[in-house]
Amino acid sequence: MAATHNFLMENELLDLDNLDAAVESSRKALSEARESLRGIEQSISDKKNLRKVVSDYRRTRPTIDAHKKLSGKKAEAYYRANEADFIIYEAALRQLKVLAPGKKLPATSKLNTEIEALISEKNAAYNTYRTAKAEYEQLATAKRNAEQILHGTPSRQKKREQER
């Protein structure tokens, strides 16, 4: 309790209205940091998915091109032998139409660079989030303790004794 009083004195939060405002401001900052972090994580996930789809497309494209050159029974036999590649190619093509409609295929190196930049941004955002969370937890704890001091709320130990 003394630590709470010292914290409130140092930060000039002895007035409950100021303390409530500080807690609310800290909660909003925490919420904004969390949303920013989630947005960056979603962007990373989207880029990684696009990279996988492009990789699948590029890996299976030679099989499709070789099939186009064949005809008759050779084409049928080739299709049956490489059916998994055809399925992967068609799925990748459908996803590419959704993820990058009417665009050229992005270079894998460009995607990797974008992912690395997003990961760096995510790390910075996480540091901001961690700082905001620690500040919020400290203020929320101070508020609970201050309310307990002012309103004389029984401590957990006293509540347990009363229950017995």
Language model segments and positions:
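Extended intrinsically disordered terminal tails
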Residues: M1-R164
